[in-house]
């Protein structure tokens, strides 16, 4: 996988912000945090054209690598904070974009678009934090 060190800083800041806003009593009352991550593609660092986000695009393979690398950067930041249970939900297009064989093995992964709750499938009130990666503004705005 291509290393993208310039992507890591902003992604880590976002993940850290999500983690540090967890109330201390919650963070210390349990052995590990439960973190939900939903990842879209158009807002991923390095994604610049539709050719990188469409499965028929000539640069889609690179887009998938960038998406997977950004998720792994966030996951690494979560685990630097301490033990965690992390659920990652692929939320772009047909929801089968992340390179699951390259995802951090400590995560659980949901893929495929047959999910009743789509982009938030798996999220419930048992999670301590939700992190949304790669999301974008509405088309045409």
Regions found by a protein language model. Give the residues of each.
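N-terminal glycine-rich anion-binding loops that anchor highly charged ligand groups
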Residues: 36-48, 52, 63, 67
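N-terminal secretory signal peptides that target proteins for export/translocation
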Residues: 1-6
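Short beta-strand segments
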Residues: 38-39, 89-90, 130-135
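Internal, conserved structured core segments that host functional sites
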Residues: 120-141
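Bacterial N-terminal signal peptides
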Residues: 8-24
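Alpha/propeptide regions of enzymes that mature by internal proteolysis
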Residues: 58-90, 94-98, 106-108
């Amino acid at each position: 996988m291509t290393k993208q060190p310039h992507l890591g800083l902003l992604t880590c800041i976002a993940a850290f912000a999500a983690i540090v806003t967890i109330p201390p009593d919650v963070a210390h009352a349990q052995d590990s945090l439960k973190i939900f991550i939903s990842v879209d593609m158009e807002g991923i660092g390095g994604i610049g054209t539709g050719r990188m986000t469409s499965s028929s695009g000539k640069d889609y393979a690179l887009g998938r690598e960038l998406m997977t690398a950004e998720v792994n950067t966030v996951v690494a930041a979560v685990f630097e904070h301490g033990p965690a249970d992390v659920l990652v939900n692929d939320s772009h297009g047909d929801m089968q974009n992340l390179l699951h064989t390259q995802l951090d093995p400590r995560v659980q992964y949901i893929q495929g678009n047959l999910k009743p709750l789509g982009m938030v499938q798996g999220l419930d009130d048992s999670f301590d934090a939700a992190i949304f990666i790669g999301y974008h503004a509405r088309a045409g705005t």
